[in-house]
Amino acid sequence: MAKIKANLSALLPGAGLVVVFAVFSLLGGARFYGAKNLQLILNQSYTVMLVGLGVTLIYAHGGIDFSVGAVLALSEMVAAMAYKKAGVPAILIIVTVLAAVACSLITGVITVKLRIPPCISSLCMQFTCRGVVNTVLQNKTIGVTELAAPGWGPKLAVLVVFALAVFILLTYTKVGKYNKAIGENIRAARSSGINVDFYRIVAYLVGGFAIGVAAYFDLLRNGVMSTNVGYGLEMNVITALVLGGLSLSGGYSATVRSAILGSLIIVIMTNGLMIVGVPTAYIGIVQGAIFLLVILFTYKRDKLGLLPR
């Protein structure tokens, strides 16, 4: 019976994606499934997918990260400023990754070493990064429109390679296995000799790397850096992971599939609701209600990453 339940749970995200796509195809018609809109869906889901894949290890050990959108914005701003000063396009990817990894490392160290709840430490990082971006930009923008945005070939290659890397980490390495074990039972993990602090911090480094790469592609796609960059990304990532089947309590529910399927579901849902004429304010209400319902059925109350671990 337990095996049947587990198999059904694994199938639900895929079935949900098919249902959501079918419903909006019927309601929106060619406006929804036209080539132009499908390309828009892929572009919108790319950042969520990439970041979602990266932070999967954080959620695997029962953590949570509310700072991803703000860290993405800060990384893009610093990279755009560095490019304007140096004039070397290659500096963009270097700076976005270094800035994002540094921010995530700080969040990880504060969470793990100071025993600050991850929701609090990541919110502090969010406020700090947003404050820096707003203070520096002062509602101005930094344009990099002279640089060509990568086509879907390179972007897809990066996504596939990164998804494969995260899959290998989760399935075959100590980093993935130990983070999932920590999410299942942190006390048992410590008792078995796992260096809990080290592997949790490594998870934040992986997440930071993903945010940095996503920031690079996002900056080139938009062609401009503004204070609006990254707003709402954290909730889209969390909702995507949960809709994809990952439990916020962590553990062995953490999979690559969660990030990919969940990202497509949340973006298709948002896009479809807009196409059929649902006001933006109501879309937020719908997303919030769905997120709450899924959370109620997936997390274990005593293990949600709201308390010091």
Task: Kindly give the residue locations of the regions a language model identified.
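Transmembrane helix-bundle core of multi-pass membrane transporters
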Residues: 5, 114-175, 201-202, 221-230, ...
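Alpha-helical transmembrane segments within multi-pass membrane transporters and channels
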Residues: 86-127, 161, 261-262
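Helix-loop-helix "hairpin" substructures at the membrane interface of multi-pass membrane proteins
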Residues: 88-96, 102-107, 151-226
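Hydrophobic alpha-helical transmembrane segments
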Residues: 10-15, 41, 49, 70-71, ...
